[in-house]
């Protein structure tokens, strides 16, 4: 389990990105890169890290399921992820 502070910081970044998304889009369309540069750093979507919603783990993150490989494996074995079953060929 990740530290609560790291998870909270990532949530704060996500909110910042959502808050400035429209303004950032407008400035980018105008080509006003100087104004974009003056926006807060955390308002850039590039600074977001994918984190597992179950454990908060930043590594081994699977975007499609929004969870880490470890949590994915655990939930898949229990049959708690719809449409996912163990492969065999």
UniProtKB/Swiss-Prot annotation:
**Record note on quaternary structure:** Part of the 30S ribosomal subunit. Contacts proteins S3 and S10.
Keyword ATP-binding in annotation? no
The species this protein belongs to is Oceanobacillus iheyensis (strain DSM 14371 / CIP 107618 / JCM 11309 / KCTC 3954 / HTE831)
Q: Does the UniProt entry include the keyword Ribonucleoprotein?
A: yes
Biological-process GO terms, alphabetical: translation
S-S bonds: none
What is one cellular component GO term in this UniProt entry?
A: cytoplasm
**UniProt-listed InterPro entries:** Ribosomal_uS14, Ribosomal_uS14_bac/plastid, Ribosomal_uS14_CS, Ribosomal_uS14_sf
Function of the protein: Binds 16S rRNA, required for the assembly of 30S particles and may also be responsible for determining the conformation of the 16S rRNA at the A site.
Record-linked SUPFAM superfamilies: Glucocorticoid receptor-like (DNA-binding domain)
Q: Do you know which Pfam families this protein is assigned to?
A: Ribosomal_S14
Q: Under which name does UniProt file this protein?
A: Small ribosomal subunit protein uS14A
* Family as reported in the entry's similarity comment: Belongs to the universal ribosomal protein uS14 family.
Task: Name the keywords, alphabetized.
Answer: Ribonucleoprotein, Ribosomal protein, RNA-binding, rRNA-binding
Q: Which PANTHER family match?
A: 30S RIBOSOMAL PROTEIN S14 (PTHR19836), SMALL RIBOSOMAL SUBUNIT PROTEIN US14M (PTHR19836:SF19)
Q: Name one GO molecular function term.
A: structural constituent of ribosome
Q: NCBIfam families of this UniProt entry?
A: PRK08881.1 (NF006477)
Q: Which residues form the signal peptide?
A: none
